[in-house]
């Protein structure tokens, strides 16, 4: 949908960041209002404006996020290594996040969204502002993730919808105006 259509708001509702003004939302059978902790265990979220700690090192940040999800010790080390490999952060893992390009920051955001191995990924404009090479890499990663997880993404780029999506939902002023398979 267009700017202001309600895409980001809907994503914030699904991820339990804000409550709906009316209606209900369930994620894998869990109500976002009544069972928000269960929903949060199952959802990974990459917001449009990726809130990263710029003074932290990549590996340090992923360890911090793992701790938030109660992943510690060897399990945390294993997940961090898996996320670094999956997102192509190997050469950047010892750098401060503030020193990374936008493309690598997006990769850090994806890694943090997946650190707890959620079954649902919610990505709000995950390729906005990326250069052509970064765009290809991130789209490939999202496509691969879609083979094993449910991925909900918002975008204004129709080529991205065609490249990444099986289904499209168009929202305008908070109302679904189209909902169909591609």
What are these regions (language model features)?
Residues 15:
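Helix-to-loop junction immediately C-terminal to a conserved catalytic motif
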Residues 23-31, 38-39:
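Conserved ABC transporter NBD signature motif
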Residues 121-124:
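Catalytic Walker B motif of ABC-type/P-loop ATPase nucleotide-binding domains
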Residues 135-147:
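Helical segment within the ABC ATPase nucleotide-binding domain
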Residues 179-180:
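ABC ATPase "signature
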Residues 63, 67, 74-92:
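Conserved ABC ATPase "signature" region
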């Amino acid at each position: 949908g267009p700017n202001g259509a309600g895409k980001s708001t809907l994503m914030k509702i699904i991820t339990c960041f804000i409550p709906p003004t009316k209606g209900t939302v369930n994620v894998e059978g869990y109500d976002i209002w009544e069972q928000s902790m269960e929903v949060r265990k199952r959802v990974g979220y990459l917001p449009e404006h990726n809130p990263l700690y710029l003074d932290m090192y990549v590996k340090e940040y992923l360890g911090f996020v793992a701790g938030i999800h109660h992943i510690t010790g060897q399990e945390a080390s294993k997940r961090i290594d898996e996320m670094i490999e999956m997102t192509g952060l190997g050469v950047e893992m010892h750098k401060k996040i503030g020193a990374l390009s936008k493309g690598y920051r997006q990769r850090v955001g994806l890694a943090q969204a997946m650190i707890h191995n959620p079954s649902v990924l919610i990505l709000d404009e995950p390729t906005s502002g990326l250069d052509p090479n970064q765009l290809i890499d991130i789209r490939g990663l999202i496509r691969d993730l879609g083979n094993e997880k449910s991925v909900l993404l918002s975008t204004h780029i129709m080529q991205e919808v065609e490249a990444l999506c099986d289904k499209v939902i168009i929202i305008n002023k908070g109302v679904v105006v189209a909902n169909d398979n591609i």
